[in-house]
């Protein structure tokens, strides 16, 4: 069975983390590296609607270009889109990987 870690290893061969700009937050954002994966949703941005669609579709992993966590995190609450998205991903057991500047450079 394919696991999140298997896909992350493959992605690292395409877009190595060391290619990311220093200010960027590319890479594994959230989730369980050991979780099994049968469906992957690909999106430009990790919006709340994206997380909801992944949950409805039964995806265990989302791959995005832009990261969910970009600015320093001060809190994760229902009052922000990032907080609501993170909560939904955690509740549904969905992992998130973002390939931003490392993917741009690759």
Model-derived segments and spans:
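Hydrophobic structural segments
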Residues: 1-106
């Amino acid at each position: 069975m394919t696991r999140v870690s298997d896909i992350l290893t493959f992605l690292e061969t395409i877009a190595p983390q060391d290619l990311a700009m220093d200010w960027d937050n590319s890479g594994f954002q959230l989730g369980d590296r050991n979780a099994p994966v049968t469906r992957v949703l690909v999106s430009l941005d990790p919006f709340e609607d994206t997380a909801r669609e992944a949950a409805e579709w039964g995806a265990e992993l989302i791959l995005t270009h832009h990261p969910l966590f970009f600015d320093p995190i001060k809190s994760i609450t229902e009052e922000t889109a990032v907080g609501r998205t993170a909560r939904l991903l955690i509740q549904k057991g969905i992992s998130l990987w973002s390939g931003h500047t490392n993917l741009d450079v690759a």
